Amino acid sequence: MSDVARLAGVSIKTVSRVVNDEPAVHPETAGRVLAAIEQLGFRRNLGARNLRRGSTTGTIGLVVEDVGNPFYSELNRGVEQVATSFGRHVLTGSSNENSERERELALEFCARRVDGLLVVPAGTQHGYLVPEMRAGTPVVFLDRPAGDLVADTVLVDNLGGTIEAVAHLAQHGHRRIAFLGDGPGIFTASERLRGFREGLVRAGLRYDERLALLRTPTRESVADAVDRLLTGPGRATAVIAGNNRVTVHLLRALAHVTPRPALVSFDDFELADLLDPPVTVIGHDVGRLGRAAAELLFARIHGDDSPPRKVVLPVHLLPRGSGEVAP
């Protein structure tokens, strides 16, 4: 608070009164204090004590796409495991793939003076976090990088995983391999598409843009994609699904399709190994993704000021049956 008081030309006691909305502060004085808080990158928060160096609210913030998605539920569990070990609680919110909602949640968590912030980006503009970071709030991005901000980032090997999926299908005789991914503006979808194209090159196969579709996965959009990819003389004999949600909709759409194409899913999901045939997946430890990001965040909270890091976690192919179907 001393920095705010110095800039506003008032006492620390006056700053405390303004932050706590106490009466008997002249409006012009309060305006100077609030302007100083904004200039220094602070936010009005739950108490003046949070402006003091070294204070803690015992919380961290986590912004994900959708807490109802099992992928993010598992990621949240990993974050909570680490946070609990440090005596912190996790505030979690869903952006619903909306960049403005992401911004609102992140800034609301910062206004509550979380000790650190974890963000799965919904957009590519994150300059709004610069004042918070300058004010001392550590920020780590996970699953996707920030578009315009150099910051700690924890990812999985999207590129390598899809390359491996293509190689696996090619080894089983497939030459017409399709890719169905999430929306084109999503980092993981574009990276997995890039891996798909690279995998085709490595396997000596031609890229056919008609067999690569990116779209927001809904029951209707995936059913339409199946019609496009799996009918006609140039149909695909194998499909790589870009994430768990795409796979679930794809399985529903394939229920009455014959012959069934080979299928590899990027992301494992519950009961995948019990289906008929069991689903071959590019698996990775989602809980580990959350833990790795949280561990990096707490390193920053505890004073690690080394340059921003990019951590890429490995993936692995789990052959179960659907990816081994012959053309």
What does each model-identified segment do?
Residues 223, 227-327:
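Flexible loop/turn connectors
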Residues 113-121, 178-181, 212, 233-246, ...:
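Periplasmic-binding protein-like
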Residues 97, 119-164, 245, 267-279:
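Flexible loop/hinge segments that line or gate small-molecule binding clefts
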Residues 152-179, 194, 198, 202, ...:
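Hydrophobic alpha-helical segments within soluble ligand-binding/sensing domains
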Residues 1-56, 324-327:
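N-terminal helix-turn-helix DNA-binding module of bacterial transcription factors
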